[in-house]
Amino acid sequence: VTESALILAAVWKWFPPRRWAVCDGVSYGWGLLYEADAIAVSKAGRVHELEAKSAKADLARDHKKRKWLLPAQVDYFWYVVPTALTDPAVALARPRGLGVISVSAPGANDVIGNSVRLLLPKPLRSQNRVRDRSDRPRLWRLAAVRYWDERIRKPKGETR
């Protein structure tokens, strides 16, 4: 299962784009010093970061990073993993209060696979901080810019 398939399955199941502002590949435009696989913003303004990991070594390497110790822009952090990595992801995530979404491989009649939320994350920062109401529209703008940037760069006739 590819990392992009993991993110797609998790987003469609738990962060449906009609109810959440969702954008993939977010970094500087959101104020992050690294690229997040996906960001989802709720109507209440809560920001969820989704990080897909498809290999145990990649999961362990990412977990050693300190990006969630100074959560300026992210309220909740989720690992999105294939079912084979569920136990290692839960073991790493639980002590830090991170969430885990496990995604099975797609079946014959299922394009994006089934996802099961296994571990709910704890807030990374104080929920009392008032978030700017411009966060959702700002993320939608980022998503639109990213979409058209990809369309312009994609060779003619190539499909996704």
Regions found by a protein language model. Give the residues of each.
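Anionic group-transfer/hydrolysis microenvironments
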Residues: 26, 39, 53
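Acidic-and-aromatic substrate-binding clefts and catalytic sites of carbohydrate-active enzymes
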Residues: 29-32, 58-60
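Active-site beta-strand-loop-beta-strand hairpin of nuclease catalytic cores
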Residues: 31-49
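A short acidic/basic microdomain associated with nuclease active sites
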Residues: 15-31
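Non-catalytic C-terminal interaction segments of nucleic acid-processing enzymes
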Residues: 1-14, 89-160
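A generic local structural motif
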Residues: 8-9, 37, 62-67
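Catalytic cores of nucleic-acid endonucleases
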Residues: 47-48, 53-103
